[in-house]
Amino acid sequence: MTTFMKYLFQTNDKFSYWVPRVILGCVILPHGAQKLLGWFGGYRLEGTLGFFTDKLGVPLFIAILIILGESLGALGLITGFLTRFCAMGILMIMTEAIIMSHPANGFFTNWSGQDAGEGFKYHILAIALCIPLLISGGVRFSADGFIAKRFPL
């Protein structure tokens, strides 16, 4: 394997990193399913693409990457496949969401529904969960770990 592939699949056996990987994947997956499949009250692929491109002005290619990042990236985190790649994608999506969509709404979550939108504290938590995954990789019980052991470098 190349040096890049070695870095991509290299992992360690610390169980504590398993928790943020699986939890982040499980939290992000419903958002991806809303955008891609229309589950949980979402608008499916066509509706979401229309919203991103027409209302937010996001280029079509970037909108597709966001939808795939939230859906397939979350599945990648849950299974531990390409963990660093998926974590970086989600980190970039959450950073963009803070910058582009949520600064006017402030920090806090809109629990009462009286404000115009949601704050960005959820996004900061998701970013914080991505950082140890970028450092550690998939760790125990991950496809990355299986690949690294099966194909030693």
Q: Each predicted region: which residue ranges?
A:
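Extended, low-polarity transmembrane helix blocks
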Residues: M1-L37, L60-L68, L72-L153
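Membrane-interface interhelical connector segments
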Residues: L37-V58, I62
